[in-house]
């Protein structure tokens, strides 16, 4: 939740949830030489094909990304803006649980990246 500024007390959905998933998909796709795949969900699908040992993580990331995009779209339509900032106090209890659950795949994909690129010195 943003602590100050214009978006105080809102959650930066793009910066704190979507971008980590987007960036992870890009990094991993580049490392595998995946080309001509232009969106995040397709990148995770291709990664799942190429790395069956990590397929559950990639599939969970694709699902979380789709759910987060849904939150952003609904927020944008409701407030006639880009939906980047989510007012958590307006979410139903179920939506809060869904949002919270969408962060586990982010943690999991970050672990995959740390292991794949041996980034243990940065933790």
Task: Kindly give the residue locations of the regions a language model identified.
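Conserved nucleotidyltransferase catalytic core and NTase-mimicking acidic/glycine-rich helix/loop elements
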Residues: 1-123
